[in-house]
Amino acid sequence: MISLETDTKYYNIEIIRDLFDDLLVVCDYGSKNTKFSHRKNIHVSSMAEANLVIDKILKIREKHHYRIIK
């Protein structure tokens, strides 16, 4: 899992397989100040495509001042 955050927001990314054995990039994101969150599932056909999707997401999040946390 890759975790990113700003002072008030968080964004988590992971690669999983669903019940049908399809590959998904799952993004959970929301505000640290409320209990509400969102989930986005992106269907991909291979690990290479999943890594491309994650790289694109990371570039966008970095432009919005998110930082990677460990």
Predicted features by range, described:
Residues 14-40, 63:
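Short aromatic-glycine-(Arg/Gly/Cys) micro-motifs in beta-strand/loop hairpins
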Residues 35-38, 45-63:
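A short, charged, amphipathic alpha-helix used as a generic interaction element across diverse proteins
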Residues 1-7, 36, 47:
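Negatively charged, low-complexity tracts enriched in Asp/Glu with abundant Ser/Thr
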Residues 5, 24-25, 48, 59:
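Compositionally biased amphipathic helical and low-complexity segments enriched in hydrophobic
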